[in-house]
Design a protein with these regions (language model features):
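C-terminal catalytic "cap/lid" subdomain
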Residues: 1-137
């Protein structure tokens, strides 16, 4: 973190961390998202952008339900619920960390231009919504 604070360009692996004892460890599935959110929180970034293989957060898995709708925005609480129920677009720990440190996250496609989906503490557009999304678990 010192090199980042000194305005030095830093190359950081996305799924590794250091334990309290100083040992390098891997963070598991979604570790790159967690790393990005942690760094954004540490440096006081106004937002953390996560680039992935989808255009944002959808009402359900668009690979399973072709007419699923992309959400322009969603609350941290709603995203935590979707992630904990199996939505794979963001790992639960990354969303929990973003929520804890109030770091808005924008999920964008690595392959397509677009506005993606903003995940934040409060979402005015969803104020009167009953259902934001549906997560499917394949058994």
């Amino acid at each position: 973190m010192n090199t980042i604070k000194d305005n030095t360009i830093s190359i950081i692996t996305g799924f590794q961390g250091v334990t309290a004892g100083g040992d390098v460890t891997t963070l598991g599935r979604g570790g790159s998202d967690t790393t990005a959110v942690a760094i954004a929180a540490q440096v006081g970034a106004e937002r953390c952008d996560i680039y992935t293989d989808v255009d944002g957060i959808f009402t359900t898995d668009p690979k399973v339900v072709p007419n699923a709708k992309k959400l322009d925005s969603i609350t941290m609480e709603e995203m935590l619920e979707l992630a904990s129920q199996g939505a794979k677009v963001m790992q639960t720990r990354a969303v929990e960390f973003a929520n804890k440190y109030n770091v808005p996250v924008r999920v964008l496609s690595s392959f397509n231009d677009g506005s993606g989906t903003l995940i934040s503490q409060k979402d005015e557009s969803m104020e009167n919504s009953v259902v934001s999304g549906l997560s499917l678990i394949h058994i």
